[in-house]
Structures are given as C-alpha cells and as structure tokens.
Amino acid sequence: MSHESHHSEGMATSGEVHEIREEEPEIETMHIENSVEGESGRQRTESTASVNSESWQNSDEMMMNMRRAQSLLDQGASCFQIIQQVFPEFDASRFENMSERVHFKVLSDLLERAPTRQKLFTYNSLSDAVDLFRTRKNILVLTGAGVSVSCGIPDFRSKDGIYARLRSEFPNLPDPTAMFDIRYFRDNPAPFYNFAREIFPGQFTPSVSHRFIKQLESSGRLLRNYTQNIDTLEHQTGIKRVVECHGSFSKCTCTSCGNQTDGMEIREDVLAMKVARCKICHGVIKPNIVFFGEDLGREFHRHVTEDKDKVDLIVVIGSSLKVRPVALIPHCVDKNVPQILINRESLPHYNADIELLGNCDDIVRDICYALGGSFAEMIASYDACVERSPSTSRAKRQLITQQEFLNICAQERRDKTPVPEPESSEPSTKRPRMSTTEDMEGNQFQQIQKHTSSEDDDEDNTRNSDEVLREIKHPRLISITDMLNDKKCVAISAYQTVFPGAECSFDMETLKLVHDVPHRNRHESDSSCESCSTVPGSDKSEANPLSRSQSTDDIVYAEIRRKEVFLDLQRCDSCDNDLQYELSDPIDPETFAKRIADMCIE
C-alpha cells in the first residue's frame, strides 16, 4: 500500500504571477498565487512539487528543464508559455483556456517527471530474468501493494482496490486519497479509523513474494527491500534489510502531546473502528504511517544514496511507481543496471527491460521453480503450511509463444462461431437482411439494453456493460487471462511474458498488449489501475505519471468538474477529486525555484 510524501514549505496568497528578486540564491523565485472559486474567500495552495533536495534524485535532464523554466519565468513568460517552449512535444492545447493554477500544476508535473529510461536489449525473456536472479549479488527489490494482495490485503488502484471502494463506502470523502492526507486526518480522523482495521497487522500471513525476497536475502543476493507497504509483513517474514518507505503501524504517536506508544496498544480501537485517543491528553493517536504531506525522513534518503551505486539489478514487484520519491529510485541508478517489472500491468512511465505481467505470486513461483534448490524448497515448505487456492499451479507453467497463443485464440473463435443454416431454394418472404456490420451493431445494441435494463446489481451491471462496450469498440481485443489456463504463460512479445491475472488485453491486429480501461461516466474518476492506461511498447513519452497526479487527463477532468460541482468548505480543505496533488501543508510556487536551487547543490 503506497503513500507519497515529501517536504513542503512556503505560502501563497492571491491569483497572479509575481517575481520576487533576491540577492541569494542566484536562481530567482517563482511565485504563483491562487484563489479558488467556491471557497468563501479562503485561500489554499496546491502543487506537485515533491523533488527533495537529496542529491540522489538529481537528473541532468530534469535540471536543464527546470533552469530553462526559471529563465523563461524571469523573462516574464506565463506557465502556459513555459510549457509550450520547454516541452514542445507535449500537447498543451487542451489546457490553454484553463486557469493559471492548472497551468502551474501541469508545468510542475512535467518538470518533475523522471527522465525516460532506455531499455537494455540484452535482457528480454523470462529465462533472462531467471539468469539475473541466479547471478546478481546486489538486488534491490522495490515492492508495492501487489505483493500483499494474495494475503487478503487490498491494493489501492486496481479496479477493486481501496480507492475504488472508498468512493462508495465513504461518499463524504472529497477524494479517496484524502483518507491518507495529514491535514484531513487532523480535521476528521474517523474515516481512517473506519478503514484501518482492514490493513492492521497481525491478521495476515506473508505471501510467496515476501518469502522469495527473504530467500534472496538468505542466499546473499538482496541489497535492500524498499517497501511502500505499511502492513509490516516484511518484518513478519524475517527480512532484515528492509526500508519501510512509508512507515508502518508498529509505532504510534499522539498528535497533541507527541507521546509515542507501541502500535498494538491501539489494536482494540482499530478493530472496533474507534478513533484511538491518548491516555495522557486524550489527543488523537496517529500510527507512524507516512501520510500525504509528511516527509519520508533522512534514513530513507541515506539508504538510497548508499545503495544506488552498489545495485546490480532492480526488481519492481506489485507497484504502480506513481508516488514520489520512491518512484524515482529506478531512475537514479546507472543506466546499465538491468531492471525487471513484476506486476499485473505494464507501466507507461517505466521502461523495464523485462516485464512479467500477472499475479505477483504466480510469477514468483515460476521463478523459484526455475531457480531450483532452496527457492524450490521454499515453495514446497510454503505450500505445506499455507492453504492455497485450488487453481494455484504446483509446477512450473508451460511457456508458449505468441504464435501458439494466436492459434489458441483462433481455435476459441472457431468454437464459438455458430454454424450457418442451410440455404433454402424457395424465395424468402422476409425482408432483406441488413449488412453484417449493421446486424452486428443491432445485436450489440440489444446486448447493451439487456445488460443495462436491470438495476438490481449496479456493480455487476457496470462490469457487464464494460465488457459489451469493449467488444463493440474493440472486437479484435482478446483477454489473455481468459485464453490461458493456470498451467500456461505466454511470451507475448520480445520482452513481455504474460501470466494468469494480468489486467490487459491483446490486440489481434497490432499484436500488442492493451491495458484494460473500465468504462466510466463523466462523474466517476480514474482511481483504478495499479499501473498504465496505454499500450505498452508504444510511445510512452507523453504518459509519465510519477506524482500523485496519475495523468494530465486528471487535471482536465478535475478542472471541468470544478466548474460543474459546488464543493463545500470542508471538501475544499482537502484533496481535489482525481488530482492527488499535495494539499496537506501549505506550499506555493515560491518554493519552486528554491527547490531548483537546492537540487543544484552538489
């Protein structure tokens, strides 16, 4: 379960762009002031600025863009003009008529995107991945919610994840991410405590993926496990070389008097969905989880600084890499360090050398079977003491080629094609049939009517409608998981191997993977997906959401919604719908140039 955090400082005032000239630092400050309609005159600031002054996050490309932006600002350019000149390949036309506040958000997001990583073409296949695990001695593993899903802990951004559920279960939340926003928590901790029991430690058993990481450590291969999760399952597994990037429930702190206690002291309150109170001052107790708006701390940055020059393999397991600064780790190492992604989906903003897509535990199982020895023994030991799903493969899956997969798809379609009725020699009294296309569209329209006529189960109807709409829009798309049984995986491209559980489809025409994007109406937001919304392997330069904003499309959607929906003061005090920008501690664009200056420090 991943949360973003970064240090924020500064204040904003009212709705114009100013330059504040100082003798020091040499780079002048950029000051953008915001005022938002519908807030009863109350001002607030919001920014994507999350680049910490720690040197490991520096990038020549990012620094060059930031300096160019600052230079243009000094010359009197607006944020929109800076976007056009610094990022000419970015289509900014859809933002042109939006507010300066939106322009600043887009500019900040573009400036803080990590540089595009170039794939190493030496490493591509599943067997290449196994060889890397076998030979590398300083493996850095970055884990997200995907490693804990099989333990019964929900992830955040999948279609059935925490954020999707929060929208329906807590309609008063201005945005699902507000539950982990420190300012919202201070004002109203009840929603967090209503939910916290679902992820409170002590209720779950570590997964195969956790034990795999422990086995890497035991065999002397693990450099460090950076986890974005707060479930403490790494400690339960016995992993020593772990950094809990976003904290955990192991300790708690009173928000009033600062008294610290053991996390288990609030167990009863959490399980009873009660707000835990301090025994000394009766203040609200907050678990030592890094909420949005809180700093990760020096220890995290110290470890990354030490590890980035030692690592010889990076493995990302079950993470969307959407929250900084953790998402920047794969981009701070030497360009020749191979990288593997194990996830349900491909990530449009991350070019891994090898992509293994599907349920994390299923993929890890196959890797362990291939490695053999203590890794295969670990799987056998795990299966002996943990109840597994009957569908879980007990042996290494059969790897099939793309052509073999296409043959399976072709056979499936032949089996489903109805046998045509024999033609009658007598003239027909019926009217002429429509064209095949018209007939198909008519049948599809009837299917939509059938699926949308009943409102007994909205969730099922939505899911069924999604499937029908996908068939109408993309009849050439095939669900890979539907075509694979649990005993097979497919090398769908040179560098992508797909296992059961992958949340993607296969385009029979382009022979590429396509991310499953659920249909939504105009009042729903895109909080789903633990990764991408584009075709892996296509040009990924435009989709690079590394901050809490999943994409610039969210900015457009939120700006339109802002004009359509009146938000009361309480809702305005926290996160905007879909934006997922830092709103917790006051921060304004004045900090923008200061961060540039900080990053310039060698």
UniProtKB/Swiss-Prot annotation:
It catalyses: N(6)-acetyl-L-lysyl-[protein] + NAD(+) + H2O = 2''-O-acetyl-ADP-D-ribose + nicotinamide + L-lysyl-[protein]. Interacts with ftt-2 and par-5. Interacts with daf-16 following heat-shock, which causes daf-16 to accumulate in the nucleus. Interaction with daf-16 is promoted by ftt-2. The gene is sir-2.1. One of its GO terms (biological process) is negative regulation of DNA-templated transcription. The active site is at H246. Residues 46-57 have a biased composition (Polar residues). Zn(2+) binds at C254, C257, C278, C281. Its cofactor is Zn(2+). It is found in: Nucleus. Pfam families: SIR2 (PF02146). CDD domains: SIRT1. GO terms for cellular component: chromosome, telomeric region; nuclear inner membrane; nucleoplasm; nucleus; perinuclear region of cytoplasm; rDNA heterochromatin. It is an enzyme of class 2 (transferase). Residues 119-374 form the Deacetylase sirtuin-type domain. Gene3D superfamilies: SIR2/SIRT2 'Small Domain, TPP-binding domain. This is NAD-dependent protein deacetylase sir-2.1. NAD-dependent deacetylase. Required for a reduction of the 'Lys-16' acetylation of histone H4 (H4K16ac) on dosage-compensated X chromosomes in hermaphrodites. Functions upstream of daf-16 in the insulin-like signaling pathway, promoting daf-16 mediated transcriptional activation and increased life-span. May also regulate life-span independently of daf-16 by modulating the transcription of genes involved in the stress response of the endoplasmic reticulum (ER). Acts upstream of the nicotinic acid metabolism pathway, which may be linked to the regulation of longevity. GO terms for molecular function: histone deacetylase activity, NAD-dependent; histone H4K deacetylase activity; metal ion binding; NAD+ binding; p53 binding; transcription corepressor activity. Belongs to the sirtuin family. Class I subfamily. Binds 1 zinc ion per subunit. Its main location: nucleus. NAD(+) binds at residues 144-163, 228-231, 318-320, 343-345, 360. Its EC number is 2.3.1.286. Keywords: Metal-binding, NAD, Nucleus, Transferase, Zinc. InterPro entries: DHS-like_NAD/FAD-binding_dom, NAD-dep_sirtuin_deacylases, Sirtuin, Sirtuin_cat_small_dom_sf, Ssirtuin_cat_dom.
